[in-house]
Amino acid sequence: MDYLSESLKLHYELRGKLEIQPRAGVSNKDELSLAYTPGVAAACLEIKDDVSKSYDLTRRWNTVAVVTDGTAVLGLGDIGPEAGMPVMEGKCVLFKAFGGVDAIPLCVRSKDVDDIVNTCLLYTSDAADDK
């Protein structure tokens, strides 16, 4: 099999290897009111009172970011963050398929280590935990 050409066809066909799937139903008014407003306010207020509950009340407990600045992508060298996205998506697929972990690709357009670290901290809401 010609993996390069077949993979390129797959990428054109799928237009990305990831998608978000809802875990909560929204097929009627009651389900929608539980998953979103007004019911969601209860979870928000619980987390407001105790931030650690975000791990119990959201998918945060099982979600990671796969981060790159695009400078060292699978031996391709410095190809940039946009060109690194297919590899990051592939890694996210592996996290889910083999570990059951939800992974989100985060391709940062900066080569400055402090920028990248700060972006990750801000994205994950852990910046306050480190102060």
Where in the sequence are the language-model features?
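Glycine- and acidic-residue-enriched helix-capping/strand-helix junction motifs
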Residues: 74-88
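Solvent-exposed alpha-helices and their adjacent loops that cap or buttress functional pockets
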Residues: 55-60, 96-97, 122
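Single conserved hydrophobic/aromatic residue that forms the stacking wall/gate
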Residues: 123-131
